[in-house]
């Protein structure tokens, strides 16, 4: 049984297992939509798409982690004004373009996490149809533990949470750490809640994102605290259909 119910945005969440905070955006209830309980909007019917094959030259997934990730205080390099990251996933690949001026603090954090391969082998553990695809808990418990309290100050919101935009999840004001979501539709309702986008998925890549397995949703998804304390084996055992990031690497703006 899950330990937590999804909670409303900007409500502080208790510490789970070894201290992993539950960070997630929750869609506002709109007059024209009547979601059940706190669930996001109902799923939209997606057209069938064909997975994009990964190029032969793509790097192999790492079987362990970069030890530098155990010291978040040492990973504070300033990101370029603009950079790109290629994600190779179990559904294919997509490219993210980050514009630092949109959200400098978040863009710098993402840059350092990518440089040190934080997201390699991590899963899209929360995919809510017609809302968001969320990732950012490490496949490795020691890494998750190291970043649990590495909070960032909030960036001002300069861009709307449009479809394909990347934004840090949060457990309240100034609590961003490593979790990120990709908006699956225009989520302008998140703008006033302080969610500051910092990057965007390329248009062809959204065909890949739209294919991420979404049938667990919120009701039957994994517990964030147990992801943090047990890592990828916990997800593989209980939620084997979740899609995974094989590698996430800088390809421009290094």
Residue map of PLM features:
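Cyclophilin-like peptidyl-prolyl cis-trans isomerases
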Residues: 17-254
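Sec-dependent bacterial lipoprotein signal peptides
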Residues: 1-18
């Amino acid at each position: 049984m899950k330990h937590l119910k999804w909670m409303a945005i900007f409500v502080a969440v208790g510490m789970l297992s070894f201290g992993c905070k539950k960070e997630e955006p929750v869609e506002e209830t709109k007059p024209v939509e009547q979601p059940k309980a706190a669930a996001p909007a109902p799923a939209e019917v997606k057209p069938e798409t064909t997975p994009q094959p990964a190029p032969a030259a793509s790097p192999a997934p790492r079987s362990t982690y970069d030890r530098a990730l155990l010291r978040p205080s040492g990973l504070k390099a300033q990101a370029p004004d603009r950079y790109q990251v290629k994600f190779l996933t179990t559904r294919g690949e997509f490219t993210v373009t980050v514009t630092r001026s949109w959200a400098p603090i978040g863009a710098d954090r993402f840059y350092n996490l990518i440089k040190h391969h934080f997201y390699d082998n991590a899963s899209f553990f929360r995919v809510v149809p017609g809302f968001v695809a969320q990732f950012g808990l490490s496949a490795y418990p020691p890494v998750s533990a190291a970043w649990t309290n590495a909070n960032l100050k909030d960036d001002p919101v300069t861009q709307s949470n449009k479809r394909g935009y990347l934004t840090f999840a949060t457990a309240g004001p100034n609590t961003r750490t490593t979790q990120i979501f990709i908006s699956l539709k225009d989520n302008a309702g998140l703008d006033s809640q302080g969610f500051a986008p910092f990057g965007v998925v390329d248009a062809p890549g959204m065909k890949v994102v739209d294919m991420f397995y979404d049938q667990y949703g919120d009701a039957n998804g994994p517990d964030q605290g147990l992801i943090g304390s047990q890592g990828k084996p916990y997800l593989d055992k209980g939620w084997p259909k979740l899609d995974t990031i094989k590698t996430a690497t800088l390809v421009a703006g290094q």
